[in-house]
Amino acid sequence: MKVLAAMSGGVDSAVAAARLVEAGHDVTGVHLALSRNPRSHREGSRGCCSLEDSFDARRAADRLGIPFYVWDFSDRFVAEVIDPFIAEYRAGRTPNPCLRCNERIKFAALLERGLDLGYDAVATGHYARTKVVDGVTKLYRSVDPGKDQSYVLAVLNQDQLSHSLFPLGNSLKMNVRQEAAALGLSVADKPDSNDICFIPDGDTPGWLSEKIGSADGEIRDESGALVGHHNGYHHFTIGQRRGLRLGVPAPDGKPRYVLDIEPVNNTVVVGGAEGLTVHHIEAIRPVWCSSEPVETWHGQAQVRAHGDPVPAIISAVPGGVAVELEDSLRGVAPGQAAVFYDGDLVVGSATICGTDRAGVKAEQAA
């Protein structure tokens, strides 16, 4: 098989490429240049967009003896990932850019170019598994629960999944590092990428302030009483406690959290922890990556990349998905992805637009 190995400059993508070479595939390494100014990203970053990362990817490819190229997708990355990220925060929502990057860049722009050039598949170092069942490529969790990345891949459709390879899905991270060391790969001990790759130093509020600006606004409690001020609602997300400048203490003396963000009024609403409890989720733009389920079914819902799945009743409704949680969740924010599982099988995903806490309607978030 002729395979494009997406090489970020990290240990996982390097070992994934090595395994494909060992399996006898015709492998070409590709590093995606996603920043218009890669020197603006700090050296030693834990992202994947710095010059240092591209050099690490090239060294790994040289060690494996495979061709290597750097492909510039920076313009498309801005249009498909960065601009929507800014727009979501401006609208008071909390997006996950990694899902968008997988959907629109790694398994769209890269895959499209690869197929045009005669490649059969794109491979990455994600910790997830696929299996073809009755002609359908199904997505599953990794065997390493601590590193499972199926959540950020749940936006992929059947066409994308059928041309995707995840060589690390049956491996533990500790074994991958050992394998990298045995192969003589210089990235064997390189730290994992945890930051948003296009935000220097991980300062998301500061970065957003440069893009959106900072407008002073009010912080009010659920009764509407003024309790503080803020210098930009994009500094906050649902469930946040830190950074609240409150001049009026809560009557019960307990901590207060962000319960809602009202961008139209430039207002942040705060309240007690009990106000974060969610039992019902509304979501839009569903993607059924492992075949469309029945109209209503029992499964599990996960709302954060490293969150715990919660038993739920999941129903297809006009315009999206309704989720009744059997166990409540806290701090669920519009803009997050809800990913639906049946055990280890990833059934699909959708974008959260409202909860019984926030009360946001689907048409407002569309």
Swiss-Prot record:
E.C. number(s) listed in UniProt: 2.8.1.13
Entry keyword Lipoprotein: no
Positions with a binding annotation for ATP: A6, M7, S8, G9, G10, V11, D12, S13, L32, G125
Cellular component GO terms, alphabetical: cytoplasm
Active-site residues annotated for this sequence: C101, C197
Keyword terms: ATP-binding, Cytoplasm, Disulfide bond, Nucleotide-binding, RNA-binding, Transferase, tRNA processing, tRNA-binding
Annotated site residue numbers, Interaction with tRNA: H126, Q336
Organism superkingdom: Bacteria
Pfam families the UniProt entry points to: tRNA_Me_trans, tRNA_Me_trans_C, tRNA_Me_trans_M
Subcellular location: Cytoplasm
Recorded catalytic activity of this chain's protein: S-sulfanyl-L-cysteinyl-[protein] + uridine(34) in tRNA + AH2 + ATP = 2-thiouridine(34) in tRNA + L-cysteinyl-[protein] + A + AMP + diphosphate + H(+)
GO terms assigned for molecular function: ATP binding; tRNA binding; tRNA-uridine 2-sulfurtransferase activity
Family stated for the protein in its record: Belongs to the MnmA/TRMU family.
Function: Catalyzes the 2-thiolation of uridine at the wobble position (U34) of tRNA, leading to the formation of s(2)U34.
PANTHER family cross-referenced by the UniProt entry: MITOCHONDRIAL TRNA-SPECIFIC 2-THIOURIDYLASE 1, TRNA 5-METHYLAMINOMETHYL-2-THIOURIDYLATE -METHYLTRANSFERASE
Name the UniProt record assigns to this protein: tRNA-specific 2-thiouridylase MnmA
Organism, scientific name: Cutibacterium acnes (strain DSM 16379 / KPA171202) (Propionibacterium acnes)
